[in-house]
């Protein structure tokens, strides 16, 4: 089950899904609340609503899942796993926020002073959401991707709810802590820098860390890997 990152939706995974299916696996991609085709008003989106949508889909599956999260929404992977530990085979964090119990994604994001996105994040107080200035798409998100991905992003990226990143995670060793987790570090990432990625997986150690010589979006630039 593949969980997209900030401002994105299920279209993230359109290059990797056929490859995973060709290897004999079933793949599930969803739009989180307020994103993509999900029509929840972005102002009403909370961490709990987002996690509830994930766990609802998890509950419909007959067996265990590998839950994969990108970027900010590593937090969704962790919180959903806490609520459904018996349904989890493993957790995979792709350049994702791996945040411990009692902390928020925002706390970790503000520490990442080497990233290039912050000056281009536009806050809308009326909807309590942000958008990203398209001028930074290429450099910040898709540096090693084809130009058509940037053009698609201009059409498909949407507002990102702020609330989800400012809500503290509630994780326990008994549930979240017993599920094997793996990290995929993107070595040329300018959105979630390698420094920040390393700091997170050293604080919450993983079974194994894989490294990709890629920017923030390897599902576009290196889908086979």
Name each region found by the language model.
Residues 67-68, 91, 183:
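Conserved alpha/beta-hydrolase fold motif
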Residues 187-213, 220:
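Conserved loop-alpha-helix segment in the C-terminal half of the alpha/beta-hydrolase fold
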Residues 152-175:
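Active-site nucleophile elbow and catalytic-triad environment of alpha/beta-hydrolase enzymes
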Residues 82, 86-88, 92-130, 134, ...:
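Flexible "cap/lid" loop of the alpha/beta hydrolase fold
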Residues 68-73, 77:
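Gly/Ala-rich beta-loop-alpha elbow adjacent to hydrolase catalytic centers
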Residues 26, 34-68, 82-83, 106-110:
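Active-site loop/oxyanion-hole signature of alpha/beta-hydrolase fold enzymes
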Residues 1-37, 65:
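Conserved HGGG/HGGXW glycine-rich cap/lid loop of the alpha/beta-hydrolase fold
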Residues 177, 183-185:
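Short beta-strand/loop motif that positions the catalytic acidic residue
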């Amino acid at each position: 089950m593949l969980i997209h990152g900030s401002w994105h939706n299920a279209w993230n995974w359109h290059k990797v899904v056929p490859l995973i299916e060709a290897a004999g696996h079933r793949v599930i991609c969803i739009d989180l609340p307020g994103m993509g085709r999900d029509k929840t008003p972005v102002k009403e989106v909370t961490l709990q609503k987002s996690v509830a949508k994930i766990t609802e889909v998890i509950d419909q599956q007959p067996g265990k899942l590998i839950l994969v999260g990108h970027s900010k929404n590593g937090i969704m992977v962790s919180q959903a796993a806490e609520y459904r530990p018996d349904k989890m085979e493993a957790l995979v964090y792709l350049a994702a926020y791996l945040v411990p119990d009692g902390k928020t994604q925002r706390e970790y994001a503000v520490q990442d002073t080497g990233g290039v996105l912050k000056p281009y994040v536009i806050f809308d107080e009326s909807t309590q959401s942000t958008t990203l200035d398209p001028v930074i798409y290429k450099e910040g998100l898709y540096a090693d991707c084809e130009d058509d991905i940037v053009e698609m992003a201009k059409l498909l990226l949407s507002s990102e709810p702020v609330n989800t990143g400012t809500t503290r995670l509630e994780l326990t060793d008994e549930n979240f802590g017993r599920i094997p987790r793996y990290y995929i570090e993107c070595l040329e990432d300018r959105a979630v820098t390698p420094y920040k990625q390393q700091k997170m997986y050293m604080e919450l150690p993983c079974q194994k860390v894989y490294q990709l010589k890629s920017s923030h979006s390897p599902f576009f630039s290196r889908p086979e890997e």
